[in-house]
Amino acid sequence: MRMKLGGLFIAVFVFGAAVSTFAHHGYSTEFDGSKCLDLRGTLTGLIWENPHGYFDLDVKDASGKTKSWHIELLTPNAMRRNGTTRQDFEAHMGKVMDARVCPAKLGFGENRASAEYIKMADGIIRIVGQLPEKITPEQLSFWNK
């Protein structure tokens, strides 16, 4: 009986660890780092929480229709270490900004993405996400805009 309970405990522990690892570290499962794109739009929302922050960006498409993008950020602690705070986002709410994002894969929601870089109205380019493309800020289309 003790052997069965020990085996059951180990199985539950391993399964639980695998699920939590996937839930938090599944970047390449959820986002496509090979199809990153630049978005320009109006900052309309912010969620500053663990394990990731999020912001909303209203972007006009080619036909002039506005689409709202929900974009994932690094953890708030990592953002602060990179020099970006909640107050930076709040100060730019309602203003136009640029973002380099990697879109969500099919099945993970339309108009969802993970940010790499952002450039707010103050002109500062900030690292706010994982960098699957391994590009530098100087390579961004909005570097000199």
State where each predicted segment sits:
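Short nucleic-acid-contacting surface segments enriched for D/E, G, S/T with interspersed K/R
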Residues: 81-99
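Conserved hydrophobic positions within beta-strands
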Residues: 41-43
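Bacterial N-terminal signal peptides
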Residues: 7-20
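Glycine- and charge-enriched low-complexity intrinsically disordered segments
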Residues: 133-145
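OB-fold/S1-family single-stranded nucleic acid-binding modules
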Residues: 104-132
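Short boundary/loop segments of OB/S1/cold-shock single-stranded nucleic-acid-binding domains
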Residues: 23-37
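Short aromatic-glycine-enriched beta-strand elements
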Residues: 49-60
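Beta-strand/loop nucleic-acid-binding surfaces
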Residues: 68-86
